[in-house]
Amino acid sequence: MEKKNQNTNKKIIQTSNKQVHQMRDTRTKNASQKRSKKHRKKQVFGRQSIFAGGFCIVAALAIVIGIFVSNKTKTPYEKQVITLYEKENESLAEQQTNPEAGMDEGISSGLKQVRDYGVKLPESFQNPPIFESTFTSTGDTVLDTANRYAAMYDYDKAIETIQAVSGYESNAEYTKALEEYDLEKSRLFQWNDNYTITHIFFHTLIVDPEKTFDVSLSSKAQVIAYNEAMTTIDEFVKIIQKMYDDGYVLVGLHDVAEMVTQPDGTQIMQMKPIYLPAGKTPFVLSQDDVCYYEYMTGQGFADRFVLDENGKITNEYTLDDGTVIRGSFDVLTILEDFIEAHPDFSYRGARGTIVVTGYNGIFGYRTSDYWYNWNCEYFDQQNAEERQRMYYNNENIEADKAAAKEIAAAMKELGWTIASHSWGHIYIGSSSYGRVCWDSDMWEREVAPLVGGTDIIIFAFGEDLDGWQGYAADNEKFLYLKQKGFDYYCNVDASSEHWIQIGANNDYFRQARRNLDGTRMWEAVMSYTDSSYHNRLSDLFDARDIFDPARPTPVE
């Protein structure tokens, strides 16, 4: 059944991600045939496996995202059609047996549109191994909840969950579980050095590389920028799968270090113990610019976050014919699917950090009064020329704010943290003190009320406030940001696997982040055949296994 989007009046189809990814991969395969694939295979990568064919990549991407519709085994084709907006009083079981049974004209039309994009998967991929859940349900809600806590290494919470049940002592399954939790807890080790924890980050994921890398849809300069700074969904899925297979476990910034109140009332930053089984390695993850900027519209990226009918965060993506589909098309939603299947990838429920500016709104909603409200009471002449160029009145701005606020609350409920990226995506180091103050005030005014504030600032462009030695006591920008409540500061530096600093006065936490994007992966790929390139990712994965052949090369 079709729905109408109040703002866009476009058709919305609830679907699994396989549909849009299969569409994209089919188009990408056709586009890649136009390039000199044979030459790149021989001269650039030095190995055949990465180009084993778009076929495997098509299938892998199509089957790994959003497949958890129910516990019942379905064929790939059934999975594709089963999550279309349900029709009232329609039998789900009948749909699983016959995807077209009982569907009205609107649904049938929607299915035809989906089929027209070539979504049906090859028969050989009816039993996909990727994102196959490692968590086994017992059928007991309490026990399943406790087991999920235990899988995330939070044995105390698992024990509390069981012991909260009246009469648990007489339940053999519960008492056995408690014994197992105690045993597994005793086997944990404290991570030996929090200073060695790496921090990786991404920008908005590319859903459709053919569109993203099409100069006719943007510009040559923009395509180059996308190719350098962005990561495709194919690459992201392979990265997290590889890291999971190698024993990496996601921790939050607040798991690494925390502000501790002293007896005299002062607070100092201290490393926080992390307890994991032997063979596990903690890492931090963040994603920059989760705003779905207007300039990216129609260029192969998700449009925005929305909450589905169950209150779950999902993405919207617009097809070429204007049909809007929903699914997991970006870091947060894909990672949620992955953690649902692999709870042991998350340390005590930890998630990543979502990093937002404010000038263009957040999460795909145009929430900035400064840019989008004719009646903005605090507009001044600063940036007047740029404002005139971008400015239009968003008649739905209050509804957009409310929606963004709900999204932020849902993110935090899942365990995600939200960080400032500055309001205007400014160069924090080279900007004047006055500019930094004005920008910080704007983020506090326009974004903080929507996301609930934050103590994390992740600098735009990777630029920092000061040199590696530390923030000087008289650094007025740092003092102003500290006054605003920021305790965690992150830049970009991929020159080493990890870099962390706690201030000389124990008043801040500072960490370098590593960009896992086209630039870094291309450097890593080329390093195998050209010594002038440096491989900065070898501790995480072999970039030749990750690099998406849909990318234009060289990436530079």
Predicted regions and their residues:
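Short, glycine/charge-rich beta-strand/loop segments that flank catalytic centers
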Residues: D255-P263
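N-terminal, intrinsically disordered, polar/charged segments of Gram-positive cell-envelope systems
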Residues: K72-L188
